Amino acid sequence: MKITENLGEFQKFIEDDSKTGLCLEDTLGFFDIQRIFGQFESIKQSGIRVTLILTTLLVMLFYRNRNIHSYFSRQHGKQMGREGSKNPYYDLLGNEHISWRSILYLFAKRYLNLSGRIAEYSGRIRALIFDDSPLEKSGKKIEAVSKMHDHVTGRFLLGFKILVCGYWDGNNFIPIDFSLHRERGSELDKARGKRNRARRKARLAEAVYREHRAQHLETRAVLNSLRDEMNVCSKKATALEYAKQEKRVSRSKKKQSRLRNRMKLAQAILEEKEEVVRRKEKKAPLYGLTPSQRRRQYRKNRDKTSPGYQRRLEADMSKTQSVINMLVRAVKRGFEFDYVLFDSWFFSKEILARIESFRTKGIKLIAMVKMGKNLYRDCLSSKDMDANTLRKQYRNKETRNRKFNARYIKVPVWYDNRRVNLFFVKLGSGSKWKAIITNDLELGFNKLMETYHIRWSCEVFFKDAKQHLQLGKCQCNNFDSQIGTITLAMMQYMMLLLYKQMHYGHSLGRIFDLISSQAEEENITRYLLELFWEIVNGIGEILKVDCMELFEEMIRDNQRAEEIMRLFSPVFEKKPAA
C-alpha cells in the first residue's frame, strides 16, 4: 500500500490539531510582538494597527488558510459577522519602509532567549550556516524574477534563488537572515565575456599595428632621404648607411605584414564571438527572459533610503558578497558561534579573508571546496598544486576511519597566504573524493565530519518550510511582498519550534525526541540526520553511489525517504529489542 501521509517536521501541528491556532497564538505572546512590531506603527497614519496586521499574517496559516484572501473572506468574515478586506494586509506586506530584516533578527534573538530558558545547550557547537535553494514562481511579471538553474535537478526554473543564513544553537536550526537573487544567465554571460576579451585583443592588435605602421613610414622617409642624398653626391658612407636603412625597411615591412595579419585574425575572431552572442541573446536571453517580457515586469520607484530599496539591490548582488554582508550583520547583532559552514558554491578567498578577520572572536570555517583548478601551496614542498595533485601527492598518508566508514587524507597547506588544512574524504567505496577546508588547525577528522553534518539542517528547514509554511509560494508582483512573506514563514518556523519545545519535548529532556517510535512515524527527516547514516552508507556501498549526495536526496525527497523507510521497517522493529 502506498504511503501518502506527509512525514515532515510540523505536519501534526498544522493539520491534525484543531486547537493549534489558538495554542500558537498563546505561544506568539512569549515573543513580545508589541515591542518588535510596534516600532513600525508610524508607517500607517490611520486604520488597522500595524501590530494587529502583522500578528494576523503570522497566525492565519495555522487556521488552515493558505493565503490572505481565503482568510479574510472566510475565517475573518465568520468571526466578525461581515466580509473582511484583504487590502490593508497586502498594502502593508508590500510596504518598502518595513525593515523585515530587523524584525527577523529581533524574533530570532527572542526565540533563543526563550529556548535557553527551557533547555540548556551550553558546551555544544554553535554554527552559522549558509545555503541556497530555488523558489519557483509562475508569473513572468513578478518583479526581478528570472530563469535560474537548479543544480539539484539540473532543470531551469522561473523564480528566485533564496540564500539563507541560519543559526545552529546546539540543537536547532533557525533562519536569521536571507536574500533573494536572480540569475543573469550563465551561457549568455560566458559568451559576452568571451566577446569582450576578443574585443580587447582586437583593439590591442589594431593599436600595435597602427603604431608600427607609423614607425615604418618614418623608416621609409629616412630611406628616401638617403636616396636623394646619394643622387646628389655619391659618398661611400652614404651608400653604406642607405644599405643598412634598406634592410631596416625590409624587416619593418615584414613585421607590418605579420601585425596586419594578426589584426585581421583578431577582428575575424571578434566577429565570430559577436555572432555567438547574437545567437545566445535569442536562444538564452538576459535573465532567461526576452526584452519584451522584462519590460512587462512589475516596477516600483522606491525611496533610496528605505530597507526595501536595499533588498531590491541585493537581487543583482553576487552571493559571495551577500554571504559576507550576512556574516558581518550576524556578528554585529550579537550572535555567538564557533564555525561558519557552507558548501563549495560559496567558498572564495574573500569569504575566507572575512572569516579570518573574526579570529579574535573564535570564529572558524568549515567548507566543502571544489576539486578544481584552485591552487594551494603545500607546507612541506612549498609548491603550488591543485586539489587533485595534492591528493595524489599524499596518497600514502591515507587513513581509515571506522566511525564514518571513510578514508581521508589531511594535508596542511597555504591558501591566499593563509594557513589552512585540507581534508580529502572518501565515504564508502562508491563515493568520489571530496575536499573539505578548515582554518581550525587543531580540528580532527571525527569532529570535522560531525560539525559539517550540521549543515544539512538547513536542507531540513527548506523542505519543511516549503511543504508546510508556504515558503516561496507568494505570487505577488511586488518584490517587497516576496520579502515580507518569506520573513513571515521563517518566523512561523521559529514559533513552531518553540511550541514543540514547550508542549512536546521538554518533558523528555530534549526539544525533539528523535529516538522514539513517534519520531520514526512523524519526523523522518530529523530521524535521518541522527540514525540513518549507517543505512545510507550501506546503500551507498551496495549501489556504488556517493553517500553524501544520496543523503541529501533523501532529505529533499519525501517519496524516496518513505520507500527506504518501508524497505528497512523490519530492521527498525528489531532494533529496540536489541
For the regions a language model picked out, list residue spans one by one.
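Domain-level cores of phosphate- or acyl-group-handling catalytic modules
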Residues: 208-278, 286-380
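Electropositive nucleic-acid engagement tracts
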Residues: 37, 43-48, 64-140, 146-147, ...
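Short, conserved catalytic/metal-binding motifs centered on acidic residues
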Residues: 56, 71-73, 124-138, 165, ...
